[in-house]
Amino acid sequence: AGRDAMIFPTMWSPFKIASFTYVFSGSSDEKFMRHCKEDPDSVSAGVQAIADTLEDWAEGFLDAGADGLYYSGQFSEPGRFSQKEWETLVMPSDLQILNRVHARKEKYNIVHICGEAEHNFTASPERYKKYPGDLFNWDVHRDHFTLEQGREYFGKPVLGGLDNHGILIHGSAEDIAGETRRIIGSFGKKGLMIGADCTVPADIDVNRLRAAVMAAREV
């Protein structure tokens, strides 16, 4: 990794990539979900094959000098799966990859808990308590799970606080700086990495992000 910044490649979960094989071949997420319910064993076999490949991919990232993974945990949106279904279908492949990183000395897992647009960007952070994450990130504005709650629940540092559908996009630089100061003032500096709740647009004005960075440095 570089001297000035740590490197965390993004990796989507095997389950999400399995869904992509449907969507990008002209099928749909709805059909994938139907197959998960009707024939979970076949879906699990396919997801396992993807997980085995991604596990090797993750190892390659680490060997090349990455400091860990920014891992996008998926499919915990309310209404997709029951807790039992999720633990059977989704969780094992997540843990396969995250445990591989966790076993490496001085390598770290950033666990991003992602909700998709068709589910109003909501997810279920409470399902990730047993994940070997070193830093946790979720949508505090839509999951109704605050940074303070996350710090206590996970017992780990947390990332986020800035609404990637709100102030980061529509606010002024002064608004963003003010919100950054408010978050840090409320939460404190310990165990917090200020950031967005989820992905920001690729064409975002970098000065918006800079406003948050500079405000955080000044607190």
What is the role of each PLM region?
Residues 1-219:
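Active-site loop segments of alpha/beta catalytic cores
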